[in-house]
């Protein structure tokens, strides 16, 4: 198959195919007797797997997996996929935890009128590093006030809500949906606890969709491994 035909079939550019070859994530193209580049069914299996995995695992993980498969290191490739799945499961647990916290707040089981937390306290409570909190503040996603007595940053309860929400999306893939959710968090009003819970639910639905995308990618990965005779 000519590269142009493979590109059209997978809705890619021929330059993308050349980049994949240069990055070592697909085998080099073969040459016909006239010297023209051509792809085999094995190339197509690689390309279909990359397209399927990228939406759920991202190109970085997908590329690393393809290189490991080309080196016939199946075990490392599959454990890398397993690690990505574990991270997604962790993010789902974080989203569910945020929803539970907002439910408790709505029922009055927490104190929304507290003085908030210092950056160290917020980092310890949420598990988000101080450097990340400073970065989020620099990007305008959260805001802090200054303690009048010592000048330390303090995050109010509404800002802590934002931190819990952003923590849920901290490691997810860059996508239009993740950007939209972060913008919703940025615009979240201090007194709108109900909207905070809605955003947490939207984040959970987004993670559920990613889980389905990972399943689809795993199916194509299985097909590729079987074609390459990498499975026992």
Predicted regions mapped to residue ranges:
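Phosphate-backbone recognition surface of nucleic-acid-processing proteins
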Residues: 139, 151, 158-161
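Amphipathic alpha-helical protein-protein interaction segments
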Residues: 116, 124-127, 139
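Short alpha-helical "recognition helix" segments of helix-turn-helix
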Residues: 6-7, 20, 122-124, 136
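Long amphipathic alpha-helical coiled-coil segments
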Residues: 143, 147-155, 227-231
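Arg/Lys-rich, alpha-helical DNA-contact motif
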Residues: 1-10, 22-116, 157-232
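Major-groove DNA-recognition helix of helix-turn-helix-type DNA-binding domains
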Residues: 17-33, 130-149
């Amino acid at each position: 198959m000519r590269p142009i035909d493979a590109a059209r079939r997978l809705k890619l550019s021929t330059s993308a195919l050349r980049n994949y070859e240069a990055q070592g994530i697909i085998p080099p193209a073969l040459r016909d007797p006239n010297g023209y580049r051509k792809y085999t069914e094995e190339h197509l299996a690689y390309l279909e797997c990359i397209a399927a995995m990228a939406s759920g695992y991202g190109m970085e993980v997908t590329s690393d997996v393809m290189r490991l498969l080309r080196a016939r290191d199946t075990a490392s490739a599959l454990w890398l996929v397993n690690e990505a799945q574990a991270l997604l499961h962790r993010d789902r647990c974080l989203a569910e935890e945020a929803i539970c916290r907002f439910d408790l707040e709505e029922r009055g089981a927490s104190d929304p009128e507290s003085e908030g937390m210092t950056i160290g306290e917020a980092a310890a409570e949420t598990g988000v590093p101080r450097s990340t909190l400073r970065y989020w503040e620099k990007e305008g996603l959260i805001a802090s006030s200054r303690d009048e007595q010592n000048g330390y940053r303090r995050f109010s309860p509404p800002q802590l809500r934002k931190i819990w929400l952003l923590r849920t999306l901290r490691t997810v893939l860059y996508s239009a949906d993740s950007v939209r959710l972060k913008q919703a968090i940025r615009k979240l009003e201090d007194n709108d606890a109900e909207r905070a819970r809605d955003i947490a639910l939207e984040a959970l639905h987004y993670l559920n969709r990613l889980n389905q995308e990972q399943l689809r990618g795993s199916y194509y990965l299985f097909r590729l491994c079987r074609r390459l005779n990498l499975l026992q």
